[in-house]
Amino acid sequence: MANNEHVTPGEDDQQITLIDEKGNEELYQVLFTFDSEDYGKSYVLLYPASESDDQEVEIQAFSFTPDENGDASSGDLFPIEDDAEWDMVEEVLNTFLADDDSNLKD
């Protein structure tokens, strides 16, 4: 997780509503947020709140402008369009998931 200041796991009550291109609203749970010194941005990773724990979930990632509490809100989410930036986000996610798996085994 080089080049990242911190990773903050999402709290149970941290949810964001996203609206798709058809105008449908879907509630997402915040998995975690982190900052990148290389890109000078904050990032949030989300998964659908409707998914059960035993299902494989599709995780969505966005850059965001933190509010006064340092949190993300749906109005301040921006798509990640750069391949190198995506690679960095995937590396952070994979490290987070590997750490989470090792904590479950302890």
From Swiss-Prot:
One Pfam family assigned to this protein is DUF1292
The record, for InterPro entries, names: UPF0473
Provenance organism: Lacticaseibacillus casei (strain BL23) (Lactobacillus casei)
Q: Which family does it belong to?
A: Belongs to the UPF0473 family.
Protein name in UniProt: UPF0473 protein LCABL_08490
Q: Which HAMAP family match?
A: UPF0473
Source taxon at top rank = Bacteria
